[in-house]
A protein has these predicted regions:
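Conserved NAD+-utilizing ADP-ribose enzyme module
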Residues: 1-29, 34-42, 48-118
Length: 118
């Protein structure tokens, strides 16, 4: 599977400017809690899919979109199955909102911004 190496799995997440600010406020170490209308946190398995969301969804919705890349301990992700959201390249994990703190604890290193769209 793409993004896998040893004990960690590389994931991506497209974010808008508001979520990026909250990530920056964490020292680039954590994703913010989900809003009440967001019951699931969706990190994706490919940079290509994250770029598509950031460019095609985040930019029209909020004026800019960013792609973040980060590594998560494989042992944490083994508790979740990969979900297909549409096409075969649209793969993501569905992490319940109440488990975002545990997800953040499983992040290894910093969250990096790897692309920006306006």
């Amino acid at each position: 599977m793409p993004g896998e190496a040893g004990d960690v799995v590389t994931l991506w997440r497209p974010v808008g400017p508001g979520e990026l600010k909250l990530i920056q406020d964490s020292g680039m170490r954590a994703f913010p809690p989900r809003l009440p209308e967001q019951p699931i946190f969706y990190p994706v398995l490919s940079e290509e899919y994250a770029v598509k969301i950031a460019r095609d969804w985040n930019v029209p919705a909020s004026g800019s979109g960013y792609v973040t890349r980060f590594e998560v301990r494989r042992s944490f992700l083994e508790n979740y199955s990969v979900q297909k959201a549409g096409g075969s390249a649209h793969l993501e994990y569905w992490i319940p909102a109440g488990e975002i703190s545990a997800f953040n604890e499983a992040i290894v290193g910093e969250i990096k911004v790897v692309a920006e769209f306006r």
